[in-house]
Amino acid sequence: MSEKYVFSEKHPGPLVVEGKLTDAERMKTESNFLRGTIAEDLNDGLTGGFKGDNFLLIRFHGMYQQDDRDIRAERAEQKLEPRHAMLLRCRLPGGVMTPEQWLRIDKFAGESTIYGSIRITNRQTFQYHGILKSNVKPVHQMLNSIGLDALATANDMNRNVLCTSNPIESELHQQAYEWAKKISEHLLPRTRAYAEIWMDQEKVATTDEEPILGSTYLPRKFKTTVVVPPQNDVDLHANDLNFIAIADNGRLVGFNVLVGGGLSIAHGDKATYPRTASELGYISIEHTLAIAEAVVTTQRDWGNRTNRKNAKTKYTLERVGVDNFKQEVEARAGVKFEAVRPYEFTGRGDRIGWVKGIDNKWHLTLFIENGRILDYPGRPLKTGLAEIAKIHKGDFRLTANQNLIIAGVPARSKAKIDALAREHGLIDDSVSEQRKNSMACVSFPTCPLAMAEAERFLPEFVTKVEDIMQQHGVGDEHIVLRVTGCPNGCGRAMLAEIGLVGKAVGRYNLHLGGNREGTRIPRMYRENINETEILAEIDRLIGLWAQDRQPNEGFGDFTIRTNIIRPVLDPARDFYD
């Protein structure tokens, strides 16, 4: 695709990419503010899916059309269309919900989805898999009835806003969480399409306007976090816009703003690369929404609409320069950034088990492998959480590590909730640190982009890694391990110490050199290798780490220090070196 750049005398970098717009831009332009013909399509009983532009437009309403890839070939032989069903992702800024909401969510999963499960995602919300077309409208109405929605959790908008799950510092977490909600609400689309289609609200005569997102919305997906150091559980460097909380005597006073992180790449396309976020500066809290809006509108106007593979904020920053982007944000917000305030990250993992907060309430973080809540043989996780929800008076909090926190438990209720959790397999004291720090995306059988297994592959693979670590005497340690089924990066393998990126069925690219804090991108070490080859490499490397590491040296740092792999310093230029 030929692209030409428009240069500005004020900003010497190329600000806007001119050329033929992508078909996604046509679709958004013609969609009548995201309505399309979704309402009519819902009444078409001849197909289980959505047709034409509606296939993509439903993403703005929080859904993806999928099918069961395990039976796709079989259905094709029978001359049947794929078994279409929708993934629906809830908007849940900061991951906080009430037990009453959870019980309704649980009931719908059991009664109205193919798989019967609730999947906690690493974007701190939950999603349903396997919603048939006849249940699409009811799920939106169910969410609305409990004060939730699925608006803007997919496609070219600001997605679900993450917030550090930090129940110990309850007051600071609450302040950060309130800002996550405010940012989410401020950046929502203003179109009435969602309410008209799903809630049967009457169309009004007024003209739709999108003062922030614009009539063609953003060039690409946009992700935002609110981060409370020293925890980087939200993996800020995977996100377009990040607000790092700066506190004074336990009170939130402002944010460091970082822009332009992102992990997605395309195999074989060296114009795509992961990127860590760049520091723009510090702002006091009263400027938060103005800065959020200015970053979004700058990306709206300057982002590449001619090539979706280069449309994210990270590519805009590389094209126009961080300083130019910063100046534009300042001009639009009417705010000058101050110097970045000191901050430090020490880890990303959740504190599994019971912790006591400064408010004297107790908080139980449950490890949910792969975030998949279902009644397994001997481990009825879904039933257990429902039983806890019936008696718990605090919050349920979903984490960006796909776990769940029973938050705000008074001392008198602690023993009862602990007993229920153990009875239903929600607490397992034998779970290793390695398993707690391993993560995978969904991948097969529902994800249409999957190239290799991830969620179904991870549990047994971790067992093999655990065995290797035990053999080398480091069984109590952990390595941040992530598996993603394709290079789009949902499993965040590009911020792992060991990252596996799906290349084909049974084959992965092996990346090394990230760190525990999530501030360094790993480099590809071996390409397109199978599980046996991966385990052989891991065995050898863990042996070296166990023998030659320095005190408290993480595996990723060890691989860099000993020149096993070179660090990625400037991914736009050296990721593929």
UniProtKB/Swiss-Prot annotation:
Co-factor note (free text): Binds 1 siroheme per subunit. Binds 1 [4Fe-4S] cluster per subunit.
Its top-level enzyme class, in one word, is oxidoreductase
Q: What GO molecular-function term can you cite, just one?
A: sulfite reductase (ferredoxin) activity
Cofactor(s) needed: siroheme; [4Fe-4S] cluster
Of the GO CC terms on this record, one is: sulfite reductase complex (NADPH)
Identify the Gene3D superfamilies for this entry: Sulfite Reductase Hemoprotein, domain 1
The record's listing under Pfam families reads: NIR_SIR, NIR_SIR_ferr
The intrachain disulfides are none
Protein keywords: 4Fe-4S, Amino-acid biosynthesis, Cysteine biosynthesis, Heme, Iron, Iron-sulfur, Metal-binding, NADP, Oxidoreductase
Residues where siroheme binds: C490
Residues reported to bind [4Fe-4S] cluster: C441, C447, C486, C490
Q: Which reaction does it catalyse?
A: hydrogen sulfide + 3 NADP(+) + 3 H2O = sulfite + 3 NADPH + 4 H(+)
What Gene Ontology terms for biological process does this UniProt record contain? Answer: cysteine biosynthetic process; hydrogen sulfide biosynthetic process; sulfate assimilation
Known partners and oligomeric status: Alpha(8)-beta(8). The alpha component is a flavoprotein, the beta component is a hemoprotein.
Q: What does this protein do?
A: Component of the sulfite reductase complex that catalyzes the 6-electron reduction of sulfite to sulfide. This is one of several activities required for the biosynthesis of L-cysteine from sulfate.
According to its UniProt record, which protein family does this protein belong to?
Belongs to the nitrite and sulfite reductase 4Fe-4S domain family.
Q: What is this protein called?
A: Sulfite reductase [NADPH] hemoprotein beta-component 2
User: What's the source species for this entry?
Assistant: Pectobacterium carotovorum subsp. carotovorum (strain PC1)
